[in-house]
Amino acid sequence: PELTRPFFASMRMDLERTEHDQESFDRYVYGSAEVVGLMCLRAFVHRAGRPTFDGTVLVDGARALGAAFQKVNFLRDLHADFEVLGRSYFPGVDIRSFDEATKERLVADVQSDLDLAARTVRLLPADARNAVGLAHALFQELNDRIAATPADRLVTTRVRV
C-alpha cells in the first residue's frame, strides 16, 4: 500500500488536474514514477534472494531514475500534453512562452536525476544491471536530444530516439 496508494493517487490527478504547482508536481512525479522505481528495486532485490539492501543509496537511485524518466517524458510530450490533453506538468512553465533558459533548466534537472541514478546502477543485483543500464542509456540519449533541440521546436514536435 505504501507504494500503490501514491501511484493510484497520481493516476487520479490526471483525471482532474491540468496544471501543477511545485507541491502537486512533486507528489505526481513521486506517485507516477518514483514509486515504480521503488517497486522495481524491490522485485530486483527479492529475485536476487537478498532480504535487505542498502536503503538510502539504492532507494535514492531508484527514485531518481523514475523521476528522470517521467520528466523526460514530460519534455518529450510538451506539445501533445498541452495542445491535445490541455495539461501543463512543469510548475510555472507556460508552453506559449517556453524559451531556451527554461528548457536548459529543466534538462539540467533531469540530468541531475540521471547522474544520481547512474551511480547506483552498478549496485543493483547482476541480473537487473544490464536492463536498468540500457533503460538509463535510452533516456540519457533522449535527454541529450532534447537539450540539442531548440526550445521553439521542442514545443511543436516530439523528440525521438
Language model segments and positions:
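Catalytic cores of Mg2+-dependent Asp-rich isoprenoid enzymes
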Residues: 1-69, 75-161
